[in-house]
Amino acid sequence: MRCLPVFIILLLLIASAPSFDALPKTEDNVPLSSFHDNLKRTRRIHLNIRECCSDGWCCPAG
């Protein structure tokens, strides 16, 4: 019975703890999801260039 008040106090402390962001962030506090979006966009651009370059007429110089 002595543990019950301690248990209740611990539950109250846990419930009142500050919440945290669900999205992981980098050192600059930028959501990591934005970096994943940039990676997807870059991959899509490179894939489009490869499809375009298979014909050989629309490849960018370089």
From Swiss-Prot:
Q: Does the keyword Manganese apply?
A: no
Report keywords, A-Z.
Answer: Amidation, Cleavage on pair of basic residues, Disulfide bond, Secreted, Signal, Toxin
Modified how: Contains 2 disulfide bonds that can be either 'C1-C3, C2-C4' or 'C1-C4, C2-C3', since these disulfide connectivities have been observed for conotoxins with cysteine framework V (for examples, see AC P0DQQ7 and AC P81755).
Propeptide, residue positions: 20-49
Q: Where in the cell is it found?
A: Secreted
State any single GO MF term: toxin activity
Pfam families the record matches: Chi-conotoxin (PF16981)
Superkingdom assignment = Eukaryota
Q: GO CC terms on record?
A: extracellular region
Signal peptide feature range: 1-19
Instruction: PTM Alanine amide: list the residues.
Output: 61
| Full protein name | Conotoxin Pn-B02
Q: Which organism is it from?
A: Conus pennaceus
Name the lineage: Eukaryota, Metazoa, Spiralia, Lophotrochozoa, Mollusca
